[in-house]
Amino acid sequence: MISAHCNLRLLCSSDSSASASQVAGTTEVVENLVTNDNSPNIPEAIDRLFSDIANINRESMAEITDIQIEEMAVNLWNWALTIGGGWLVNEEQKIRLHYVACKLLSMCEASFASEQSIQRLIMMNMRIGKEWLDAGNFLIADECFQAAVASLEQLYVKLIQRSSPEADLTMEKITVESDHFRVLSYQAESAVAQGDFQRASMCVLQCKDMLMRLPQMTSSLHHLCYNFGVETQKNNKYEESSFWLSQSYDIGKMDKKSTGPEMLAKVLRLLATNYLDWDDTKYYDKALNAVNLANKEHLSSPGLFLKMKILLKGETSNEELLEAVMEILHLDMPLDFCLNIAKLLMDHERESVGFHFLTIIHERFKSSENIGKVLILHTDMLLQRKEELLAKEKIEEIFLAHQTGRQLTAESMNWLHNILWRQAASSFEVQNYTDALQWYYYSLRFYSTDEMDLDFTKLQRNMACCYLNLQQLDKAKEAVAEAERHDPRNVFTQFYIFKIAVIEGNSERALQAIITLENILTDEESEDNDLVAERGSPTMLLSLAAQFALENGQQIVAEKALEYLAQHSEDQEQVLTAVKCLLRFLLPKIAEMPESEDKKKEMDRLLTCLNRAFVKLSQPFGEEALSLESRANEAQWFRKTAWNLAVQCDKDPVMMREFFILSYKMSQFCPSDQVILIARKTCLLMAVAVDLEQGRKASTAFEQTMFLSRALEEIQTCNDIHNFLKQTGTFSNDSCEKLLLLYEFEVRAKLNDPLLESFLESVWELPHLETKTFETIAIIAMEKPAHYPLIALKALKKALLLYKKEEPIDISQYSKCMHNLVNLSVPDGASNVELCPLEEVWGYFEDALSHISRTKDYPEMEILWLMVKSWNTGVLMFSRSKYASAEKWCGLALRFLNHLTSFKESYETQMNMLYSQLVEALSNNKGPVFHEHGYWSKSD
């Protein structure tokens, strides 16, 4: 079977009307949809079908009968109803299927032939329209509702035209009108959603006219208008909201049995509120009338409160207000409601009525267990109006009642404490610490010995803060001790312990408090809200601690606080400032310390702080230029500091590297001028040197690879900087290039880098390389774990060539280079294989002889070594039956013998004798004349 996706292609057409192939495919599409399994192509097929249905009409489907079309439509509709949650079809696609089914059905003439068919079409359009309405597609919803109205009109005509009993006809007309009523309601919903007030109101008024014939729809229309009123009020459309709420009330009155007085009162209260929000001056009377009517319908506390609120908006006299509040008392409203009315009066500056009402309330509810609420509110209102003496009298009254059996509830107690603390905080803010203590003392009096909660410890800390500001140290210590007894793990408790220790000059105690404070901050963040420190930043306490310690001459304590602040603060500027302050304190002290474990610990401490500063510098600054400039300035300071610390670590290379790398990182935030680039290059060079040394000393292959790989990365970065500087033309002869070359060669050689040969190809061609550079390459090439004898040989050849070009030649350096070259070319031992032909090696010996013969400065020990080397080579050749070559090399040794002075007598006799025996043996074709004793070493 062809998939639905493929079939839908038949429906696509560029023409406005459907092609024959389009229509022919429609049947297959629908059949595939309703018979196919849960294919992943189904959602796409539905969407294509929905988009193409607009191009299909009855004329284009002339070859298909009405019965076939109706069957397709019904099957599609029913299939959409059966789709469950396991299908890939969403709710909107189900609506689209219903829509297509309805459009197909409406093309059938049979759908309009019978009343039953028309009713089915009405039902489908109403349902689809409501679904589109709920989905937010109002245009298609309106289209469906219009189609439903048209079908209803057709159905009504058919009812009139046929002859039926009057009773049956009446019932059928009522059914049609009921459907019409629902369609009008839906159309009103759509219009409101689209902001079309005129169309919505016309639909609703039309529904309202139908209520005489459809009384059962009254409640529905009443709630619909109420919902419209709520929605438009939220959107500040007060005029429209007033209309809808008025209609809701009018309609609700038509059927009070189903609506009820509570609902009518609710509508009227919302209407009154709407008038207030619209214009409380212009519509004051309407608002008051609405709320009065609401209270008449159903008296309730919200209605009474709203009425008082409206009265306070107008120019109501105190006498009228007093009458209104007395009415509330006569209605036996609860205490909390009366208190809310009193507060409302106070908030609108009607103090005389408000305080009088409070007095009446107190008398009215004096037997209530919540009578304390009246006194507390009275106290609060007095304090807000600066009537502190009267407020204190009320507090004493509350305390007396509390002590004599009229105890406050927990809720009332919390309320009272909040009022007292608020008043204390106000006094604290204006530095009236004595007055603040009085209010805190009132709060303290209400605590019993078995009620020591966290708020009690907070109270003790607040009192301690006041005592400290009044310089009453002993009382402050007592308060803090009490707080510590109940809440020792509180950051603010530890902060006050710290402050007292600093004031007393007890550095040890202060340090312990700072350490404890840091531990608490590490464990969990405090959300305390004492009078000190910002609530959102517990680390601010560390900043305050550092500042307080400095102000009181406790530098060591301040250093610890700054260190913790830099470690824990998330504030960029705060961390940088803390690190700078700490460094300014520590640098002079560390500079004077002798090399010791203590100095190393201090250096580690500084390194940690500088790394923290680097992390903060790495975080984004603001986009303003000033912020970028500020970061550069900060980085410049830290860069220089790290550099200076690195220089001080000459006895600790590892630590020195850390500071140089840190200086390099800091410099990346600075403008890349020549000075900064040179500094970066130097930092990296020093780091490479340390990493190479670490690699040489590494105890495992893994460690060595790690150090060397890190060095290689640093070398490559350093090379980039050096090449950039060379472009300026002022660093062409910089010795750094040769150093980098040697470093890179050593790293690549010891890492057994496959790119080593290609790297050296460019090295050999570099101009101005010195003999020392080539000799160093030779040494590195043979230094374990590297083993590149051919590279070493080539380097020594180049070095020797450079020595020979010197005028005058440095014969001492020449002799050493020759020694190394010969020793590498012809290793000791009869089993070794030469790295180059002996003819080439012979040339080295001849070259050495030529220089020996021209100067008396050639070191005799080197001449002796060459003599022994050539003699032993001759012996080696003899052992390989290369007799002519043996005679040649031994003869060469005799030539070196002639240039010896102090060592000549020791070797001359024996060598001449052995050489004679060699010549005689060769001429007589005898066996070997050399045995093990024929090999010589320089020490023989």
UniProtKB/Swiss-Prot annotation:
GO terms for cellular component: central element; chromosome. Gene3D superfamilies: Tetratricopeptide repeat domain (1.25.40.10). It is found in: Chromosome. Keywords: Chromosome, Disease variant, Meiosis. Testis-specific. Not expressed in adult ovaries. Transmembrane segments: none annotated. Pfam families: SPO22. It comes from the Eukaryota. InterPro entries: Spo22/ZIP4/TEX11 (IPR013940), TEX11 (IPR042861), TPR-like_helical_dom_sf (IPR011990), TPR_rpt (IPR019734). One of its GO terms (biological process) is fertilization. Interacts with SYCP2. Interacts with PBXIP1; may prevent interaction between PBXIP1 and ESR2. Interacts with SHOC1. Interacts with REDIC1. Belongs to the SPO22 family. Regulator of crossing-over during meiosis. Involved in initiation and/or maintenance of chromosome synapsis and formation of crossovers. This is Testis-expressed protein 11. It comes from Homo sapiens. The lineage of its organism: Eukaryota, Metazoa, Chordata, Craniata, Vertebrata.
